[in-house]
Amino acid sequence: MNTNNIKKYAPQARNDFRDAVIQKLTTLGIAADKKGNLQIAEAETIGETVRYGQFDYPLSTLPRRERLVKRAREQGFEVLVEHCAYTWFNRLCAIRYMELHGYLDHGFRMLSHPETPTAFEVLDHVPEVAEALLPESKAQLVEMKLSGNQDEALYRELLLGQCHALHHAMPFLFEAVDDEAELLLPDNLTRTDSILRGLVDDIPEEDWEQVEVIGWLYQFYISEKKDAVIGKVVKSEDIPAATQLFTPNWIVQYLVQNSVGRQWLQTYPDSPLKDKMEYYIEPAEQTPEVQAQLAAITPASIEPESIKVLDPACGSGHILTEAYNVLKAIYEERGYRTRDIPQLILENNIFGLDIDDRAAQLSGFAMLMLARQDDRRILGRGVRLNIVSLQESKLDIAEVWTKLNFHQHMQRGSMGDMFTQGTALANTDSAEYKLLMRTLALFTSAKTLGSLIQVPQEDEAALKAFLERLYRLAVEGDIQQKEAAAELIPYIQQAWILAQRYDAVVANPPYMGGKGMNGDLKEFAKKQFPDSKSDLFAMFMQHAFSLLKENGFNAQVNMQSWMFLSSYEALRGWLLDNKTFITMAHLGARAFGQISGEVVQTTAWVIKNNHSGFYKPVFFRLVDDNEEHKKNNLLNRMNCFKNTLQNDFKKIPGSPIAYWATLAFINSFLKLPALGTRAVKGLDTNGSIDVFLRRWPEVSINSFDALGKGNSKWFPIAKGGELRKWFGNHEYIINYENDGIELRKNKANLRNKDMYFQEGGTWTVVSTTGFSMRYMPKGFLFDQGGSAVFCENNDELSIYNILACMNSKYINYSASLICPTLNFTTGDVRKFPVIKNNHLEDLAKKAIEISKADWNQFETSWEFSKNKLIEHKGNVAYSYASYCNFQDKLYEQLVNIEKNINNIIEEILGFKIETTENSELITLNSNKIYRYGQSETNDTFLNRHRSDTISELISYSVGCQMGRYSLDREGLVYAHEGNKGFAELAAEGAYKTFPADNDGILPLMDDEWFEDDVTSRVKEFVRTVWGEEHLQENLEFIAESLCLYAIKPKKGESALETIRRYLSTQFWKDHMKMYKKRPIYWLFSSGKEKAFECLVYLHRYNDATLSRMRTEYVVPLLARYQANIDRLNDQLDEASGGEATRLKRERDSLIKKFSELRSYDDRLRHYADMRISIDLDDGVKVNYGKFGDLLADVKAITGNAPEAI
């Protein structure tokens, strides 16, 4: 089935149906204002009509309108609209499915025409259709047709008649006559722009072949609502939209065939059923002891009617339809008549629950449509489905019990009516009344708790008997008894379903973490499901066992997190000690084709409700590739693991379900000590990261203490970061002035404070690329995103020994077992094994030195000394080749070190360690695969590396121009604040070889408007470093390098023009990327014409900078533009032809620039007069937003659009 058509249609249909319902409600005088307040018009009776506001209706509509008003007041306008919109959407989808399958009794299409687009077949056959649907009105309907101008009214009557006719077979979907929703059936149904047209025209008929189309329609119908509520605390009425997901058919088959089908095959192993179930998994070969245990619990025979299957979160019924197929095959095998089977299955075998009325409607419909394929008379048999939407008990019990007159103590229509209430209360000691009271008490929050509500099994027989009596009263009782029975049946039926015990519980349960749960649900989870409270899916997983018979099967697809996360460790322990894993298809990400990305990672499994610790389950590792590959790999039994005993999982710390690990590897955890409490969690700022953390280049170097001496404001903090081993990711600093006084005022959690500033190791807690650990020198703090490891007093292990272990293949593989999700929590890392070895310690020290040298090559390190290319004289090409040689040596050295570490560990362990993704990745920027990824060719690697290296050289050159760096001194030279002390540095000779700019303002122009712009100074920098002799050669190498990746080559351009083009179009982008949107050179820009742009060094900015920018650059440039415009006008007077066209184009461009710059000058003068000062401690994000739209990319940096003046 191609779901693209449905995906496009259904969300729009929801909006269209909602709009249509709102429009109809408006005509009925029911509306809401913008704040959601109800506005109800008074009903004014005028003869045989009633007026609601401005609209007239027949008087007969009044009772139904009043019911709508009541619902609007009780539920709220929005809920009423949503409910009525999906009611009509569901009904019309159902009729569309039935007409295409020929299931409507009269045999004609209701919503379409087989031959004439936009027509309705029923209007061509009014006598026959009227006879079938509305025989008492046949004459009137035929007359309407003959009149020739009443097709709209006629069609409306026929459609409502069809709904009434379907009520008898599907009362859950089609209400009886006088349903108030009929008033909201949209108008203009026969027009070409009717609301019906999308349903008929937008979804091809072939997409309606399978009943699962109903499920897809529903999923996409609620998709926008789902997007709107995801990530928020979810109200009870929004739980369905937030938690429902349509399960792919192949996953459903796997679950049903290995639970319902397996139940049959255990007793009848030679059954032909096995050949019909392509996803059935044969058990692994078991030991004789396990085989004997299985034989002892396997029943000798099974009657098909006795097999009970429950989906406790049935949605639109996809799982139940597959259960129907398997059960049908079982009945057929036993020789039942084909036409008898559907009713037997629907009434005896299949049970479904959901909190969503819509979904339960569609689920019931799907089951009846399946049954209709096998029994053409099924819709007339009065089948009693066991699929219900859970309802909350909001009844007036005394009133209902009185009406029910269950024990026949009251005489209707006599003086007994005067004492009804007293009589009812006098009979409250009956078993049925007590049962009713305690049952209704369970369902006060049914729309929130759903199938998690626990009904005592001992009530099952009494509930069934009570239910049967209610069914009889609903048919045979007096008017009040029928009404009361009808009210009570849903509650007693849902309680009876939850009180039973099943052979198989099969589900795709709702997913919702604690953050999304409302207060009631969260409290319920804590009390009832302490081991699985972290997510709804886990609670359903655990609760399902209480709904099973002993030895029944729990089969679900849910999030894989329960297999690994420490928050589910108790749940795993309970499962391993009390249940038996049978089979699992570990699906990972992208198993649901409708969901992209890595967030939703799933696993499908079947677990038996008994315990056999020595059982060997069958696992399939299907975590790679897309849905189609996963499906095919399962069909072909690829990546199968079936040699691990269930008890083996308990040998791994935390008992993760790491089925792919070898036994030797699993046993290594028993032999080695764990890292333990050396691993500690870091601080958190209480949600104020933007207040307390900065990237280190943002602040003055005078207020930043890299050694943790304690007399500064800003200190380094380990905060995780990208995958990197050994050393690096030193990017952030934290305000820890006066022992963190401001943090403490903010109620920050300063965990493990005694470890601050100590030497240790740190890792990234949340990482999509694997586990790695870095050396953390003295002087650092660490937060919860970059938790840390420290050696204890008198520790036999050094931090270097630990780092060698943590960066080995062994730990990388261990991490994939213990926490193969995105999180490496402190609790998880404490479980990692460690190995003491002196050689490992020495190798780690060398690895740290190499990684540190690699990290410090770049100006984003605070230990950066100078650009490596300037270390070599001669020419830039030779410098680049030498630099590449230096990088290659670093890479080769680290390769050998890591290889030696892994060899030593493998020798100690006595087995080879499997390589996992990134476990052998050398995390140096010198390694082009690490730096750029594996997707590019070697030539692209080389070109990109050369281009990037030259871009870094230009950045360093700009730094020298600004005075941040100097050719005369290594490291940071000026990174203070407000230009203070700069003149003194210059006077000392700090910039003797290559003078820094006087004011820290560098014009960045696309043409040569200033002699000292950035381009001319880059040229001067190259001349200064490599000499005059090779200047042109060096400029050409630089230009050629930039055109390899940074910018595209341009014909006929000189080397300096290429460099200018890079600086004016790409340098700022590269700078933003290098400094992670916290630039230190700010780009002042006049706008899209680029009439004027300049860079200003953040650390040299002061309150006179804008005035100087204006007087030294902007005002003179305005004069030059005007002079050039005048010159071009003079030349145009004498030019003609192509020359005139060229001159005009040049002049017009200058006029645009002049106009833009004049406007910019006005704004610049306004801000210059304000003499704005900045405090570097506030950070770039705050300071960059103080200059309105004078700067480029304000929103990208600050998160807010610039203020206009």
From Swiss-Prot:
It holds the Pfam family Eco57I. One of its GO terms (molecular function) is nucleic acid binding. Keywords: Antiviral defense, Methyltransferase, S-adenosyl-L-methionine, Transferase. The keyword Transferase applies. Induction: Transcribed at slowly increasing levels as cells progress from lag to exponential to stationary phase. It comes from the Bacteria. One of its GO terms (biological process) is methylation. Transmembrane segments: none annotated. Disruption phenotype: No methylation of 5'-GGTAAG-3' in chromosomal DNA, BREX no longer confers phage resistance. InterPro entries: BREX_1_PglX, DNA_methylase_N6_adenine_CS, MethylTrfase_TaqI-like_dom, N4_N6_ade-DNA_methylase, SAM-dependent_MTases_sf. The keyword Translocase does not apply. SUPFAM superfamilies: S-adenosyl-L-methionine-dependent methyltransferases. (Microbial infection) Methyltransferase activity is inhibited by phage T7 protein OCR (AC P03775, gene 0.3). Viability of cells overexpressing OCR is unaffected. Its EC number is 2.1.1.72. It catalyses: a 2'-deoxyadenosine in DNA + S-adenosyl-L-methionine = an N(6)-methyl-2'-deoxyadenosine in DNA + S-adenosyl-L-homocysteine + H(+). BREX systems (bacteriophage exclusion) provide immunity against bacteriophage. Part of a type 1 BREX system which protects against dsDNA phage. This system allows phage adsorption but prevents phage DNA replication, without degradation of the phage DNA. Methylation of bacterial DNA by this protein guides self/non-self discrimination. Belongs to the methyltransferase superfamily. PglX adenine methyltransferase family. (Microbial infection) Interacts with phage T7 protein Ocr (AC P03775, gene 0.3) during an infection and when the protein is expressed from a plasmid; this interaction inhibits the enzymatic activity of PglX/BrxX through high-affinity binding. Forms a 2:2 tetrameric complex with phage T7 OCR. This is Adenine-specific methyltransferase BrxX. It comes from Escherichia coli O9:H4 (strain HS).
